[in-house]
């Protein structure tokens, strides 16, 4: 349900792809059972731009299945999952690609400033990482979300994992590979409201463990 921001997202991504014209891009967009006009807008854009590929779910399956489907459908030499709200800045993609060209197989995007998040969201996020890392032998890096670059070899390794109930942050950490990090301050959400509440994040942490 990102209908308010779909056009803006595409405009920003189109500008980003133009700026990085040395690379060939595809934009795989997953509609996770939206109830607004997100899907119609995405289909309209895809008819005008063949780089845009739209995956339509029959209902809302949730964040992890949607991300898995997008990663599985991507055909590039590297894959960068990201949300449509642009809080994770596309401007960082150039830095990620530079690290990748330098030999990194995974490039993490680490938030160094979460001042645009509410107090409750910052607190819940901190609890999420601390709880998971205290109870699990598999450590996930703090303040690193799903926004990252993964080489094709990493994507292929993820696709071979048998888990049906997927906790992607854990799977990302599990597969390993040579990793680099870029740091950034997260932007405020420009349009719409977050669909991921603190309660969902808490349940997410328990499920991940």
State where each predicted segment sits:
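Short helix-capping segments at alpha-helix termini
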Residues: 17-23, 46-51
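Acceptor/aglycone-binding surface of glycosyltransferases and processive sugar-polymer synthases
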Residues: 44, 51, 55-59, 63-73, ...
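A conserved acidic beta->alpha catalytic loop
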Residues: 31-40, 86-87
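Short beta-strand/loop segment that forms part of the nucleotide-sugar
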Residues: 10, 21-33, 55-56
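Short, well-formed alpha-helical segments that are part of the catalytic scaffolds
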Residues: 2-18
């Amino acid at each position: 349900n990102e209908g308010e921001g779909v056009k803006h997202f595409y405009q920003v991504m189109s500008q980003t792809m133009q700026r990085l014209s040395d690379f060939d891009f595809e934009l795989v967009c997953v509609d996770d059972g939206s109830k607004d006009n997100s899907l119609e807008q995405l289909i309209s854009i895809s008819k005008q731009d063949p780089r845009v590929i739209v995956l339509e779910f029959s209902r809302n399956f949730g964040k992890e299945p949607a991300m898995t489907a997008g990663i599985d459908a991507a055909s590039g030499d590297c894959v960068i999952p990201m949300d449509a709200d642009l809080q994770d800045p596309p401007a960082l993609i150039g830095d990620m690609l530079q690290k990748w060209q330098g030999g990194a197989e995974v490039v993490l995007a680490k938030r160094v400033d979460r001042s645009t998040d509410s107090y409750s969201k910052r607190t819940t996020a901190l609890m999420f990482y601390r709880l998971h890392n205290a109870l699990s032998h598999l450590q996930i890096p703090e303040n690193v979300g799903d926004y990252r670059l993964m080489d094709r070899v990493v994507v292929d390794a993820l696709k071979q994992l048998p888990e049906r109930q997927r906790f992607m942050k854990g799977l990302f950490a599990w597969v390993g590979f040579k990793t680099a990090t870029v740091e950034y301050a997260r932007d405020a959400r420009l349009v719409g409201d977050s669909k991921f509440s603190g309660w969902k994040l808490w349940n997410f942490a328990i499920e991940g463990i």
